[in-house]
């Protein structure tokens, strides 16, 4: 193996060696040409089979073409004799391949060559992140529990540990079982220069497996931002801030696949998600107001002044630490003793913890205050829109839904007491027939409501018996 091969990642070198060991003995171009199917005129037939035979037997190509299951592109994983700047098969690589096949085998059909390349690459598929994770050996030292404090000064409480552990397990699961349901985003909150983005970049293992280019969730080419990446940072939570609604954010994070057709493909295909999303922000109130719950977001505040080391003080040491953290996570993954969700107790903590990061819900507060002073026995959404929120115009549908959400979640959560929704519309003098909410009859006190008094108390009150 030459120096170019030695420069490849160790896990890729091993994969190439395993592939080559399972192949037939190498032959010279002259020997291979004698085995190819010919034409009636004595030439070499331009067929997919002949091209495939060359790619499988020629020592230059053996083990060189592999389908990368992360990027879904074909990689050239060993030197082929010309200068290259990337691993991925390019148009220039195709030119060199066509030239070689023409000069050595008389194969000149570009279409047949391309088909053969796809077949041989698919038969030699590999997944670089899986190879990387499987190659790690844990040294037995616990790091997941302390990593966010070590690099970013975060707390060392159980929540911080469980949040990072859940994120790591989701990332591993998405790689080994693409499309797995995982809709959680670890969100690092703190000032500029704390190392939040660097943490996610180094967490990806290799820079090419990381991306921070996701700016809009409704971009028609959003799949291009996801393809080929494992850890995707939503920098400053720009993508969620640009979302049209909380429902769009929830839908995006919950998605398990993208369906699209890449250039040169005839049919669209389902691309199962292999990535996870991390968020960074310096805003304390970054969480979108969602009265039905924000369980998808796991905020962790960082305090760089408390960190044991800054993550960029020694990048090599930081990468080594994180690599061992992945090795620890792989030990947990292999044991099967993990869940891709919080316990009920941790979810209760999360719900309370998230309040510190939510935008103020002024509308809910105004409605709560209105109900405290209201003496009527029923209300409807239009009434609340006008009288509680002070609007003079008619509410849009989405505004009505927002009011219903405030009322129903407030009642369910115990914030609004003494009210219940009624099913059949009731008529309001000012608002017409409307669904809404009515007061619940207060439970009478125990007994008959009377209190026994003594004869002396009765005489004092001049009550005859």
Please place each PLM-identified region on the residue numbering.
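Conserved catalytic/switch belt of AAA+ P-loop NTPases
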Residues: 246-269
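Conserved AAA+/SF3 P-loop NTPase catalytic/coupling segment centered on the Walker-B
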Residues: 231-253, 288-293
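AAA+/SF3 P-loop NTPase mechanochemical coupling elements
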Residues: 222-227, 262-280
